[in-house]
Amino acid sequence: MIPLIETSALLLGLTALLAYLLGSVPFGIMMARLFGLGDLRSVGSGNIGATNVLRTGNKLAAFLTLVLDAGKGAIAVFLARALLGEDAAQLAGFAAFLGHCFPVFLGFKGGKGVATFLGTLLALAWPIGLAACAIWAITAAVFRMSSLAALVAAALSPLAAFTLGLPSAVVFCAALATLIFLRHRGNISRIAKGQEPKIGKTS
């Protein structure tokens, strides 16, 4: 008989792997091809997320990419929670986020992870997710920069978790926020120079 602790570790490892593979699905590239927009990696910033799809001028493709990228994070969390509990849900959300940023199907060269981050938060603790989405929306509306909105939402998510009385999510939010900042290094440089493209600007 396999010891219980080994079984639990095996299940957690399998959950993380499946969540990572789900996160690795490049919905942006798939939507771009489905709508005849070409290879998304050769468009605009070359990023595989919804913002870059929007640069093609196809709002429906961008919307579907946003929903699907957020959805894969949410689905990973919901399934892991239903099967194994809250710790597994956080692990699955983190793994799905890593899958989007470093997808095995694209040679580990993926997106910035913002939509998957928001979808994961909405599924993991919806008050934090709603707060992050609201912060993103307000910042985007004021400054018209998706990257800046993502950075502000990510930076404030640990504070939102703490303020809302969800201490178990503080470290999770901080870890994902750190990765989002690392993935946005180029954007941060362009923002500082006043060269960051505005939302909706076509390629």
Swiss-Prot record:
Its main location: membrane. The chain crosses the membrane at residues 10-30, 60-80, 88-108, 118-138, 162-182. GO terms for molecular function: acyl-phosphate glycerol-3-phosphate acyltransferase activity. GO terms for cellular component: plasma membrane. It is found in: Cell inner membrane. The keyword Cell membrane applies. It is a multi-pass membrane protein. Pfam families: G3P_acyltransf (PF02660). The keyword Methyltransferase does not apply. Pathway: Lipid metabolism; phospholipid metabolism. Keywords: Cell inner membrane, Cell membrane, Lipid biosynthesis, Lipid metabolism, Membrane, Phospholipid biosynthesis, Phospholipid metabolism, Transferase, Transmembrane, Transmembrane helix. Its EC number is 2.3.1.275. One of its GO terms (biological process) is phospholipid biosynthetic process. It is an enzyme of class 2 (transferase). InterPro entries: G3P_acylTferase_PlsY. Belongs to the PlsY family. Probably interacts with PlsX. HAMAP family: PlsY. Catalyzes the transfer of an acyl group from acyl-phosphate (acyl-PO(4)) to glycerol-3-phosphate (G3P) to form lysophosphatidic acid (LPA). This enzyme utilizes acyl-phosphate as fatty acyl donor, but not acyl-CoA or acyl-ACP. This is Glycerol-3-phosphate acyltransferase. It comes from Jannaschia sp. (strain CCS1).
